[in-house]
C-alpha cells in the first residue's frame, strides 16, 4: 500500500501510478474500472481519507507536461495549472480578471498552492469557483483520451453535480478562453471567507464599444445542479448605453434569479440563494464597469 504525498490531504491507496504523458494516463485509467486521476488532491484525497469515495487506482497526472503552462500566444491554460500560478501570471490578470478573483478566493494559500484549474472543474461541484469565470469568457475545454482529442464548450462539461462528460479514460487537458474583450468580474458569498466554498456566486463580462454594451455574459454558481450562463439576462444588457445601464442591470439580475434552481442544504436555504443570485449578478455586472473584480 502506498500513501500519496499530499500533506494533510494524504490518503493510503493500493494502486498508485504516475504517468508522464496523456496517452499513458489514458491507458492506465482504462485498465482499471474505478481508476481516478489525481492532480492537486485537495478534493479527491479528502474524500478517500474520509471513506466517502473508493478509488481502485490513483493515476497521478502531476508529471504530465501537456497539462502544464499558460500559453501567452493563444491564452490557453493547462488543466494542471495551480491557483497560485493563475494569481502570479500577468496575462491571466489582464485578460481574465474574474478568473483571478475566483482563484484568489479559493481556500487559503496552502490550497491555492495545490489546487488545479482542471481539478476544480472536473470535481463538478455546482459551486466550483473557476466555473463561472470561464463561462463568461466563452471557454472551450480540450479533452483527450485513448480515442483522441475533442473539444466541448465549457458549459457542456458538466452533466450534473459530481458528473462530467469525460469518459473513464479521458483527461481535461487545457482550457481555451475564447473571449478577452471587455472586463469581467466575480462575486460570491460564503460562510467563512477563503475557507468555505461559495454559498452562491456570479460572474459577468461586459464589452462596451462607443458607450454601448456590445457583448454581455452572466453566469451563476451554487444555484443550480451545474454552473450556468443566463442568456435572458445577457440579452437584457446588449445594446444598452452605459448611462442607462442601472435599470438594465437590475432587470438582468432579476432574470438571473429566475434562472436559478437552488436547493436547501446545511449552508443556506433555497429562498436565500435565489435572492442572493440577483444581488451577486448585479454586483458582478457593476464590477465590470469599475474595471476591477473586488471580492
What label would you give each PLM region?
Residues 1-295:
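C-terminal structural segment of proteins
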